[in-house]
């Protein structure tokens, strides 16, 4: 098979955090490639660098948190970019209440960097032909708990409803906290299955 898979980690999280998932995918015959970016710098610039990083190919994409948002934004803005199958893990593509609460403080705005505007509410529609799968956590463990109770099901940082993409192929909910999602063996198995078949079940 030897298909490329681009892995993109979340805000404040090193690209190495995706290493266990990458190792699982490598054992399954994929070629993982980690894309690194700085959340303190321009997100638009990171989106363009991701497009350049994958230009000329049609890799699969897997992103956690802000990494998933970057993937979604890049592929939405570059309809001609090649892609295989896409999995977003705990990615708040329609905005993030916890992020907005954090941004209400000066230190929070500094921590969020240029990502702050992306956490405002917005719609997310998938209009490309490639299948897009979403994995969301429902175990309320994470930074968001320090910023007040999050309504509805959430992973401690991202609400399940914030991961909603109109046109997504499928979404699964797992009893995991936000930071543990990319390290979960269950998540890795689901990602592998979706990259092979375009579905989780």
How should each PLM-predicted stretch be described?
Residues 5-11, 16, 20, 24-26, ...:
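Serine-dependent carboxylesterase/thioesterase catalytic core
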Residues 129-201:
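C-terminal catalytic-base region of ester-bond hydrolases, centering on the histidine
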Residues 1-3:
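A short, charged/proline- and glycine-enriched loop
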